[in-house]
Amino acid sequence: MTLYLSGLISYLAEKNLLVRSKHCEDAATIALYGIDHDSRIIEPGHVFVCKGAAFKSEFLKSALETGAVAYLCAESHAAELEAIAPTVPALIATDANLRRAMAEASAYVTGHPDHNLTMIGITGTKGKSTTACMLRAILDGDEPYEKTAIMGSIEVFDGIEHGKPDNTTPEAPELWRHLANAQKCGLTYMAMEVSSQALKYD
């Protein structure tokens, strides 16, 4: 099912995460296919999230050149970014709510794949990786990589992507992409490490 920008705007507004949206007159016809906060991996139809202490307005320019159809930003950057992209649909959150808005937008754009997975989060000071790997082995039994996706500091496997991650708990767009991949591949479980730092961000 194709999702549209108008639906995302309504979804975030219902959760009181948007201060306002601008240049969204055609939102009902703008299809969404993904969301990212890294301008280097933006694809056509993606929403670009303008975030981070090191964010530069040039990142938005780059994202738009590679196909971003809208952007999500904090209120403190809205005027600066509108000057760069005066006709591009903008979703504006308070500075305090930007991370939550990014997480909720990521869930919406990927179709809430967590609803079709059994989610298992593992946190603690020591033993998260060991526990996640043992749990996957138990759940998969004699069929490795057939039932259980994993996200952790040692390995990420979602049925499509497989490798070593950059962070124990990825940013929301990446996390939800892995969940969506696991759902697409028919996996049943997601065993993921959850860092204590990630839990601080609500």
Language-model regions, residue ranges each:
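Phosphate-binding loop of NTP-binding sites
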Residues: 99-202
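N-terminal leader/targeting and accessory segments in enzymes
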Residues: 1-104
